């Protein structure tokens, strides 16, 4: 009874499609994919920034206020 069979998965998938519809699921999948790509990109950008700081190859710029 505790096992998840392919039949149970198909029934759950059919219920989800009936409840939400294929259009809503398609847009939800696209939004989820975009969010994951954005998260991965942000993680890679932050890792690159940390490596630059550790190497010391990037110097901090002095900022001044112009009036």
Curated annotation (Swiss-Prot):
Keywords for this protein: Cell inner membrane, Cell membrane, Membrane, Protein transport, Translocation, Transmembrane, Transmembrane helix, Transport
Keyword Transmembrane: yes
A Pfam family the protein falls into: TatA_B_E
Membrane topology listed for this record: Single-pass membrane protein
Transmembrane segments: 4-21
GO biological process terms held by the UniProt record: protein transport by the Tat complex
GO cellular component assignments: TAT protein transport complex
Domain of life the protein comes from: Bacteria
Any GO MF annotation of the entry: protein transmembrane transporter activity
Localization (cell): Cell inner membrane
NCBIfam families: PRK01614.1 (NF002448), PRK03625.1 (NF002960), tatAE (TIGR01411)
Sequence similarity: Belongs to the TatA/E family. TatE subfamily.
Protein name per UniProt: Probable Sec-independent protein translocase protein TatE
Gene: tatE
């Amino acid at each position: 009874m505790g096992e998840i069979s392919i039949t149970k998965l198909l029934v759950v998938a059919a219920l989800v499609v009936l409840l939400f519809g294929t259009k809503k699921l398609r847009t939800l999948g696209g939004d989820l994919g975009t969010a994951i790509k954005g998260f991965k990109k942000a993680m890679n950008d932050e890792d690159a920034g940390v490596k630059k700081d550790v190497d010391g190859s990037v110097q901090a710029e002095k900022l001044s206020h112009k009036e």
